[in-house]
Amino acid sequence: MSSGWAVFSYAVAALAAIAIVVFIVRRRRRQAVTEPSSEVSYLRGLDFLIYDQRDKAIKELADATARNTDDVAAYISLGNLHREQGNIDRSIRIHESVSIRPNLPLQSRVRALYSLGLDYVRGGLLERAEAAFKKAIKEDPNHIQSYESLERVHEEMRDWKAAYECQLELDKRTKKKSSRLLAYLLTEVALEEAMRNKRPKEAISLLHKAKQTDPTCVSVPMYLGDVYLAQGDFKKAEHV
């Protein structure tokens, strides 16, 4: 699970970088001649990012933030680069300082909180990551990336019920139905009910719900059989 999360985090960072870089560079390059030197450094940093020259990009973005402390986009990009380089403490400090700035535009605050959440995930601080993603969602209830990351954090924390509820909300926002994932999460909730909470009836009900959600879920009959066996109901266990 951890390796899968790492791959996901790298993929998110890479796609996000490509998406913003191409757009921003094209839009702002024409203004670079007349803008302050911080703007020039910012654009150079994005250029280096395009060509995967991370160390040079960090230097230029650091110069941009030093010359203009109000350049929020440069700060967030700089923090993301530090995270990719493994400088987690530094990326956390940068994104945290941006996220608490007063009078910050909504999307900038959301982006800073989301980036902060990814920092915490990379550092293994899952409870803090959970809090950061929830704050991002509170600021922007339609921020899909935060829902996706929050669901994965809940899975990492083995909080299956929270993961299920988060995925339901995500499907509602995206107008999709992730039947296979929802069924899987329901089976994990059911297993927790049966094993930890000693509530087999609730577990059986949840497993039937998982079966309705995804009739192809192979875990359902296996778990149902286990629950029936634990109850001593060998007949039902045999005919699951």
Regions found by a protein language model. Name each.
Residues 1-36, 135-152, 156-179:
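Long, contiguous interaction/recruitment modules in multidomain scaffold/adaptor proteins
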Residues 36-70, 84-87, 93, 118, ...:
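Alpha-helical segment of the N-proximal tetratricopeptide repeat
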Residues 54-55, 88, 126, 160, ...:
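TPR-repeat structural position
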Residues 74, 108, 112, 146, ...:
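TPR alpha-solenoid repeat register
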